[in-house]
């Protein structure tokens, strides 16, 4: 059960995040704009949060318009800040970058403040997901009782700051969450579900128990040494590949929110090479390298659970 002290820390941590974001955006406004390019994605409609996306059309924004969208995006934490038709369960994504020039002292202040904001965001997420002791289904109600209308994923999302990047290229990443299990691991999970069964639409409680028992029997019939995998697809994500000329290295970043690239005023107006984010089309994905997939046999579809052949 969440204590009064925990609720106080939840609220005070969130207020700190809000305050720090206000002061950060003011600091960023004081920098010289070198370049900015961000890409708006279509809204996720209510009820469509888990729909598979085969195409995503992006719209490009540059210059001061991109900066304005970026600064508003950092502080977009509540559903009243968006269309009523847009889902409050899906975080708003705005890939891109703003490139700013400032003196060394201001750069250090900005980097330090962003690190502090990210620490607060991690603490806020930990309060909700770990310290509350609540199961996932109960967290939503608890958080929204304290902070009505909060878009939790937006509040969790960290900020990315870059120093002196030479080039930035944007793209899309298709990933899977893969976890390995033994037969006994899965049997243990199913046993827990059977001990505290719930009603899952469209089945009655009794029908759901029958399904769980059938799944349990199917797993129990496998040899003890069977290797099992959960291979669950993750919604396609925007990414950025950043090249640092001074270090001669490329780094790939998740890019759900605009990155902040800082450039020292002492080194002159070095404008980086910024690429576009093209529309996503699942039918035209080109893989640089696609290793041969391990043969898998689906055994429990709802869990994305496979037998490794």
Swiss-Prot record:
GO biological process, any: DNA replication termination
Localization per Swiss-Prot or TrEMBL: Cytoplasm
UniProt keyword list: Cytoplasm, DNA replication, DNA-binding
Disulfide partners: none
Entry GO CC: cytoplasm
Keyword DNA-binding belongs to the record: yes
Keyword Nucleotide-binding included in the entry's annotation: no
Domain of life: Bacteria
InterPro entries per record: DNA_replication_term_site-bd (IPR008865), Tus_dom1 (IPR036381), Tus_sf (IPR036384)
GO molecular function annotation: DNA binding
Family: Belongs to the Tus family.
Protein role: Trans-acting protein required for termination of DNA replication. Binds to DNA replication terminator sequences (terA to terF) to prevent the passage of replication forks. The termination efficiency will be affected by the affinity of this protein for the terminator sequence.
NCBIfam families documented for this protein: rep_term_tus (TIGR02648)
Protein name, entry field: DNA replication terminus site-binding protein
Source species of the chain: Enterobacter sp. (strain 638)
Upper classification of the organism: Bacteria, Pseudomonadati, Pseudomonadota, Gammaproteobacteria, Enterobacterales
């Amino acid at each position: 059960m969440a204590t009064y002290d925990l609720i106080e820390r939840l609220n005070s941590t969130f207020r700190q995040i809000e305050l720090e974001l206000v002061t950060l955006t003011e600091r960023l406004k004081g920098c010289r704009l070198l370049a900015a390019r961000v890409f708006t994605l279509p809204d996720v409609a209510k009820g469509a949060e888990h729909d598979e996306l085969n195409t995503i059309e992006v719209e490009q924004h540059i210059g001061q318009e991109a900066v304005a969208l970026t600064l508003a995006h950092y502080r977009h934490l509540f559903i009243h800040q968006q269309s009523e038709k847009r889902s409050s369960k899906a975080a708003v994504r705005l890939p891109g970058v703003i490139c700013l020039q400032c003196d060394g002292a201001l750069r250090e202040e900005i980097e330090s403040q962003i690190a502090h904001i990210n620490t607060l965001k991690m603490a806020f997420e930990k309060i909700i997901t770990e310290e509350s002791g609540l199961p996932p289904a109960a967290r939503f109600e608890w958080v929204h009782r304290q902070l009505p209308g909060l878009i939790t994923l937006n509040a969790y999302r960290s900020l990315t700051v870059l120093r002196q990047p030479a080039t930035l290229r944007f793209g899309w990443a298709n990933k899977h969450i893969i976890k390995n299990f033994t037969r006994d691991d899965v049997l243990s999970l199913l046993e827990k579900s059977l001990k505290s069964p719930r009603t899952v639409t469209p089945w009655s409680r009794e029908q759901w128990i029958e399904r769980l028992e059938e799944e349990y029997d199917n797993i129990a019939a496998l040899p003890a040494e069977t290797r099992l995998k959960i291979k669950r697809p993750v919604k396609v994500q925007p990414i950025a590949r950043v090249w640092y000329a001074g270090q001669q290295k490329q780094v790939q970043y998740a890019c759900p929110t605009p990155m902040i690239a800082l450039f020292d005023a002492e080194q002159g107006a070095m404008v980086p090479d910024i690429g576009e984010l093209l529309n996503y089309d699942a039918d035209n994905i080109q893989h640089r390298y696609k290793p041969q997939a391990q043969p898998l046999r689906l055994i429990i579809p709802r869990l994305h659970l496979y037998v490794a052949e």
